[in-house]
């Protein structure tokens, strides 16, 4: 979404697999701030009502919010590089420059022996995917679970992982919905998880 999307037009993006928004310039709502003021006598801004910050962190309607149009387009291209052309084609394979025999000694201590001690699962993911390239989906929503795309041996994989640093990685309703939606997408496009 680049710019305002209001009224009936807002239903179309909701039916897509991924929605990206531009911070402070894109808005998505059925009814704008003026109508809200008239009906409820509450004053809200377009950003508070349906901006990128709301849809990426609270409603989970958008999968990513970016600083400007160019960054949004670059991130969309990056996502497309991970995805098959359609639900029949296999996952794309890219050449990797990682040494097949690489060994990261920091992985020996990243996960603590004490199961009650938190650690950063995102750090573990980045250290295990090809070239540390991980594309996270809904990074600012339900942070207690991580969903995104990476590559292993050049092939796209979907990654779902609890994040022990946030709420001890517990699966609450938001995290469960986020993970289920991501798993459903991966299943529809034959992306291994």
Question: Which residues make up each language-model segment?
Answer:
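Non-catalytic terminal/interface segments that mediate subunit docking, oligomerization
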Residues: 117-193
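Short acidic/polar alpha-helix capping motifs at helix-coil junctions
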Residues: 18-20, 109-112, 159
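Short hydrophobic/aromatic-rich motifs at helix boundaries and adjacent loops
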Residues: 24-25, 96-97, 154-155
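Conserved catalytic cores of soluble enzyme domains
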Residues: 1-88, 191
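Terminal amphipathic helices with adjacent charged low-complexity linkers/tails
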Residues: 67-125
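Short, exposed beta-strand "edge-strand" segments with a Pro/Gly-rich flavor and a Y/T-containing core
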Residues: 38-44, 60-67, 110-119, 164-171
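Short acidic (Asp/Glu) and glycine-rich catalytic loops that position anionic groups and cofactors
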Residues: 32-33, 53-60, 99-107, 158-163
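Short capping/connector residues at structural and topological boundaries
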Residues: 33-35, 40-44, 49, 54, ...
